[in-house]
Amino acid sequence: MTAARASTIKASRRHRLFYRMPHYADPYIHWSLIILAFYGLLMITSASMGLAIGQPGYLAFVIAKQAVFLIAGYFSMTYLANRFSLNFLKSQDFPKLAVGMVFALLACLAFPEVNGAKAWIRVPVSSLDISIQPSEFTKTLVPLVIAAYCGDVSRHYEKGRDLWGRPFLFVMLFAFIIFILQSDFGSMAVVLSIAIVCFLIPQNPAMRKFQRVLGVLTLVGVAGIIYLLTPAGIQLVEMLPIADYQKNRFISAFNPFADQYDTGYQLINGLISFASGGWRGLGFGNS
């Protein structure tokens, strides 16, 4: 058997076994993901037991629904991991993927808002209403976009802007759509946090000035958030031209007891759970 034939057979087997991660995958990250996924399923089951009282079949439906999403997500991850190639990041097709994500984010604007945010695409399947949040995929795409441009150390750049300019524009466009058009402040904050970390990692000399500026702006931003959680900061938040539900998130974070039956309800119940359950909790199904 020729080496080329053996290589083809090996590649074919690897593609068929899409439920396995490639050999170069980090096993610690892989198993951590599996453990956290099943732990999350157990926590959802535990939290749903109280709602299942008087509703036959409700708990089984919740478990089955979450299990389907978990399995589908895992197989999708392994499928893409086995077919991922660094050459794809350097190809002409990768920017098309980033542009496609922009259109996916814009498509959310055609659907009804949920809790003040237009961040979901709703797909009715039989009696189910499946929702897809493109901003969650953006959190995975942002590191790839930055790696595609800032990870190119084989070329010499006279200007740092030639290195980080395009990924920075993509990140800003994602953030603008998510925050301004979708009104999803939480997702925007996560996307920007991921982008900042990814921009600070490369050691290319052409990026040092940009990284210093970004580091200073990050410290200023953190200080600003801390200030907004002070009495003077809350007064400033109340004057900002943002939606009331966004203001209430800052207010409830500062003092959840200000509206304990609405915006502060979840925070207060979290405090109660810590106080009543301690470090070990109250047991499975008692939350």
Model-derived features with residue positions:
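Membrane-helix boundary/helix-loop-helix interface segments in multi-pass membrane proteins
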Residues: 2-31, 42-183
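Electropositive phosphate-/nucleotide-binding environments in soluble metabolic enzymes
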Residues: 28-32, 61, 244, 261-264
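Hydrophobic alpha-helical segments of polytopic membrane proteins
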Residues: 94-99, 161-177, 185-239
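Hydrophobic, glycine- and aromatic-enriched re-entrant/interface helices and adjoining loop segments
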Residues: 114, 120, 210-287
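Short amphipathic alpha-helical coupling elements at transmembrane boundaries
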Residues: 122-123, 152-155, 194, 198, ...
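Residues on a specific face of well-ordered alpha-helices
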Residues: 144, 148, 191-195, 244, ...
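Membrane-helix interface and discontinuous TM-entry motifs in multi-pass inner-membrane proteins
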Residues: 174-188, 273-286
